[in-house]
Swiss-Prot record:
It comes from the Eukaryota. GO terms for biological process: protein quality control for misfolded or incompletely synthesized proteins. The keyword Transcription regulation does not apply. One of its GO terms (molecular function) is ATPase binding. Its EC number is 3.4.21.92. Keywords: Chloroplast, Hydrolase, Plastid, Protease, Serine protease. This is ATP-dependent Clp protease proteolytic subunit. GO terms for cellular component: chloroplast stroma; endopeptidase Clp complex. It catalyses: Hydrolysis of proteins to small peptides in the presence of ATP and magnesium. alpha-casein is the usual test substrate. In the absence of ATP, only oligopeptides shorter than five residues are hydrolyzed (such as succinyl-Leu-Tyr-|-NHMec, and Leu-Tyr-Leu-|-Tyr-Trp, in which cleavage of the -Tyr-|-Leu- and -Tyr-|-Trp bonds also occurs). The active site is at S101, H126.
Length: 202
């Protein structure tokens, strides 16, 4: 029998009695966001909406985005990345478990000096893939042109965010490149590796 989303007590300022809310609702109130699934339209819109809402509520307090994602669709991932650059608060990105494909792209998009990986996290980068291998030739050619533009966009962002030269990023994106937290730090995708009991939550 599925447990469902756990609920925790929450007391609003000025209220005596606590109400039970789902744990993610409670964490969102502390400006903690989660990308814990494949990147697709619905979760992308939720994260973007939360970032915008929390920025309107208080544009001086940092946001924290925890990532454990196998990747997913390119456009929803780019939407999250663009929103992170757009909102006034700094967005910390924290990799726990795996940040692969668009997950690593979002991870790299955090505020520089505020991108972190847990010690046993894994990061993977590669080029965007087509979903139209069995499409008619004309559609495939159009798709290939769009993929090339997306690859150029993703490559330029990695160059900007990691400080690596274009040729290094381009070469790495030719295949699946898996990295440990230490390797991701050396590659410029994250800035810090979490050490037990030394990281302060908001």
């Amino acid at each position: 029998m599925p447990v469902g989303v756990p609920k925790v007590p929450f007391r609003s300022p000025g209220e005596e009695d606590a109400t039970w809310v789902d744990i993610y609702n409670r964490l969102h109130r502390e400006r903690l966001l989660f990308l814990g699934q494949e990147v697709e339209g619905e979760i992308s819109n939720q994260i973007v909406g939360l970032m915008v809402y929390l920025s309107i509520e208080d544009d001086t307090r940092d946001l924290y985005l925890f990532i454990n994602s196998p990747g997913g669709w390119v456009i929803p991932g780019i939407a999250i990345y663009d929103a992170m650059q757009f909102v006034p608060p700094d967005v910390h990105t924290i990799c726990m478990g795996l940040a692969a494909s668009m997950g690593s792209f979002v991870l790299a998009g955090g505020e520089i000096t505020k991108r972190l990986a847990f010690p046993h996290a894994r990061v993977m980068i590669h080029q965007p893939a087509s979903s139209f291998y069995e499409a008619p030739a004309g559609e495939f050619i159009l798709e290939a042109g769009e993929l090339l533009k997306l690859r150029e966009t993703i490559t330029s962002v990695y160059v900007q965010r990691t400080g690596n030269p274009l040729w290094v990023v381009s070469e790495d994106m030719e295949r699946d490149v898996f990295m440990s937290a230490t390797e991701a730090q050396a590659h410029g995708i994250v800035d810090l590796i979490a050490v037990e009991n030394t990281w302060d939550f908001p």
